[in-house]
């Protein structure tokens, strides 16, 4: 069976993996000042990850009030305003990183500013045959 794990090769020939860091937080729990400080810290983290070659992509998301959910059941599309689940913490952003292993991904996740008051979920990224693959520099592979 072909290895389908989300791995990249580094310059030393070692295996690298892509991880998605999903940032969950309670949007209402942050003041405007705390949010601005969080964005500044996140920008610094992104610059640091970029300098070490671990940054692939990152972005905050607009508030959950702007979300639209789409479901298809029995061939019929249902579009609703808002998120699928009603929970206190909502998906607020993400980082896509290149890490040597889960331990390295955890060390990066603990530096994500919203981890101080929210949750950062770490998920390995799976590559599927037939889909374009991303190089470690964040660009699609030709």
Residue map of PLM features:
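Conserved, structured core segments of small domains
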Residues: 8-142
């Amino acid at each position: 069976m072909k290895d389908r794990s989300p791995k990249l090769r580094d310059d030393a020939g070692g295996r690298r993996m892509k991880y998605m860091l999903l940032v969950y937080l309670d949007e209402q729990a942050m003041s405007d000042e705390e949010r601005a400080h969080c964005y500044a810290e996140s920008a610094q983290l992104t610059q640091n990850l970029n300098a070490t070659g671990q940054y692939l992509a990152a972005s905050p998301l607009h508030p959950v009030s702007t979300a639209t959910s789409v479901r298809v059941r029995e061939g019929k599309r249902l579009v609703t305003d808002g998120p699928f689940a009603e929970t206190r913490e909502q998906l607020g952003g993400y980082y896509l990183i290149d890490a040597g292993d889960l331990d390295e991904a955890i060390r990066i996740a603990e530096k994500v500013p919203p981890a101080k008051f929210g949750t950062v979920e770490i998920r390995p990224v799976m590559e599927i045959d037939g889909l374009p693959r991303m190089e470690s520099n964040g660009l699609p592979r030709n």
